[in-house]
Amino acid sequence: TPLPTATDYVAEDENLQELPAAVEVSEHLFGGMPCQLGWCNGHNTRLNCLEYHRDSEFNLGTEDFILLLAKLDEVENGRLDTARVKAFRVPAGVLVEVYATTLHYAPCHTDAVKGFRVLVALPKGTNTEMPAGFQSGGGDDEKLWACNKWLLAHPDSAEAAQGAHIGPIGENIDISLDNAQ
């Protein structure tokens, strides 16, 4: 898969779906439910947003990467103090389960030269366009950005400029600043 200079995400990659392991992922990680294998690749050091799904997500990186995570139950009135976000380093080749109650978003690289390449396994249809004519019913619907994707955007993010729900308050964490100290 490509390694862009920014971050790119493909919800479902046909080449990955055709691998024999795709059936095993569906059977063993999702209990036989249809799933999609996609990827998130590139270079990133910032939080920008947090998202959650109503199902677990599985990630597997070809290089070490960092996930910026928080707990969904720490969101109060649609807001989350970014001081509650914690960084977790994931070793290359280690499969991690990001629970439905875990706020997360794009991985961060540990090496700017290598970037990150992360396989993303989710229930089929996740992170795809909302059905035509979807009407928000208020509440959590205000955060619904795509199918099975509730998004909290930092005010400094591109997603906030596109109209995403503003959720994280405080610093838009940049792990490259931590590495410089």
Task: Report each predicted region and the residues it spans.
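Active-site region of the double-stranded beta-helix
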Residues: T1-A92, Y105-Q181
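Aromatic-residue-lined binding/catalytic grooves and analogous aromatic/hydrophobic interfacial grooves
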Residues: V98
